[in-house]
Amino acid sequence: MPCRKESFLLLEQSVTVGSGEVDTLVARIGEALQLNAQRTPTSCSMAYGALKPVSRAGPSCSCVRGRSTPYPVCTPRGAARHAQHHHHHSPRQQGTGGNKRLCGRGWGRCNCRKHAGTEEEDDPHELLQELLLSGNLIKEAVRRLHMAGESPDPPGSRRVSECTETTVQ
């Protein structure tokens, strides 16, 4: 546990970085987003099983919002909560306001591009741009790093412990 405490102290310190270091960080995050996109299901509708894809004009959104994230996420962890939510209520009916769900701050219009009903995963660069514009890039990177720590490592990758820092070469 002391390692975790040190990492929080490190985050509280003010750090001055150059543009080159920021570019390197953005490149690393972009690579992590691409790698994670390759491991995730091809669409959110497939992760939810029998649920039909939601169109943009639909009255509800298939977004799942956890307590730790202020924006919608589509993960197997979130899918379990989503599926559990639907088991306790009546079947979905198009055009009714009864199945309205919050999509998180800033997503009030439920304009989630990744839930547009397409069968292909969004372009990782488009997702990176969305995260940059919404200000959630760091939160998404931390969430994905935590998820990567919970899942088994793919062959050929190296695991980073919580106590050490690594540098990009």
Swiss-Prot record:
> Region Involved in GSK-3 binding: what ranges?
122-145
Entry's Gene Ontology BP terms: dorsal/ventral axis specification
Q: Where is this region: Disordered?
A: 75-100, 147-169
Carries keyword Chloroplast?
Answer: no
Q: Where does the record place Basic residues bias? A: 79-91
Described by its record, this protein's role is as follows: Binds GSK-3 and prevents GSK-3-dependent phosphorylation. Regulates the stability of beta-catenin in embryos. Maternal GBP is required for dorsal-ventral axis formation.
Gene Ontology cellular-component terms listed: cytoplasm
For whether the record's keyword set contains Transferase, the answer is: no
What PANTHER family does the entry give? GBP PROTEIN
What family does this belong to?
A: Belongs to the GSK-3-binding protein family.
Which terms are listed as keywords in the entry?
Developmental protein
Q: What is this protein called?
A: GSK-3-binding protein
Query: Please, which domain of life does this record's source organism belong to?
Result: Eukaryota
A Pfam family cross-referenced in the UniProt record is GSK-3_bind
